[in-house]
């Protein structure tokens, strides 16, 4: 996929996708450990993913990932599902060499 940053190599985009996937999954571990940093970690992810929107060519999945993360913050009963949905959506983003 050709990205809007002409000089960004696809392997760097792939590494960013892997980072997002791992960071989102890490929220599950924080949640299970009752970490006081769950909320701030999710907010940081929302900011990072939102900031990468242009890099991923304004794909609609970016908004859905952010929406899932926000719902995870606000609806504890939906936390696990929303986090897993967000992580799986990272895999659907076009860009990079392969899927996460």
What is each PLM-predicted segment?
Residues 64-100:
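Amphipathic alpha-helical binding modules
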Residues 28-32, 50, 70, 91:
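Alpha-helical repeat scaffolds in large eukaryotic proteins
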Residues 37-78:
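Acidic, low-complexity, intrinsically disordered interaction modules
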Residues 1-37, 87:
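Short terminal alpha-helical segments
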Residues 13, 26, 44-47, 75, ...:
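Compositionally biased non-globular segments, especially hydrophobic aliphatic-rich helices
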Residues 18-25, 43, 63, 80, ...:
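Non-catalytic, well-ordered alpha-helical scaffold segments
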Residues 3, 13, 17-19, 49, ...:
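Positively charged, low-complexity intrinsically disordered regions
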